[in-house]
Amino acid sequence: ISYSKHKMVPKKDYSKTNKKLYKASNPLHLIVLKKKIRLLEEINDYARKLDLSVKQVSVSLNGNFQNIEIIKEGGNVFYDSRPLVRMNVSVSVEKKGKIETGSYGFGGRHMYEKLFETKNWKNAVDHAFNQAYKKLSAKEIPAGEQTVVLGPGWPGILLHEAIGHGLEGDFNRKKTSAFYDLVGKKVASDQVTIVDDGTIPERRGSLTIDDEGTPSQNTMLIEKGILKGFMHDRLNAKLMNKTSTGNGRRQSYSHIPMPRMTNTYMLSGNHEHEELIKSTKKGIYATQFSGGQVDITSG
């Protein structure tokens, strides 16, 4: 954090409570356009040589950089730098007239170097191709209730939508969340511990400070199945007689802050991956989700 004082001495010097996560380096200016184009061409060539079934390859390289200045009451001024880069790969394959597409993306709050590392972009292409190729022989599952085992990674979108949004403070203050009166009560299995952690280096949701100047932190939401609390911005925390958890997020300077997630995820449990599969006599193993929405009132 870069911090300065104006007019009044602040009650709390937030610059001493956490470490600045990112340097003031703009990834957009560090690699010339020609080098980016050469990388995309190399990825395209690699993907098309994987198999004769590959018919189309799409690769995008995205970069964003923000310099944040937050001026709070009392003359407190906070600065932060926020880089963000990402690569998305899409591969389409065709067999006997049937076309399927697979996709994979990766990135984070760092410079472009990790996206340019051969092992990283090859891993992305391989994932996209394998996903598309497997879908060529995929069969429809029977309708009805099914036991579902979720794989790591993107299936976490289900946790994000069905649980994460329901634990954002404003929805609970307004009593529109299914969790609003369940703090201290059991809401999940003993194996379930969920946190919101905005301090993990280089992750998309990780920020030195939130959009109100409050340092990001690791917030326990559900511990061994017991609901411990919610995510708060400053206003919602004040209205609920709580403390801000560093979750004040705003779409832009022209929007008011709201309590929203940073990196929300479930901690590892005591069971190995193979145990979960073995314990399910019949069901679905879901490894990829494309998105979704949920009614937080009903869950």
What are these regions (language model features)?
Residues 1-299:
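N-terminal small-residue-enriched
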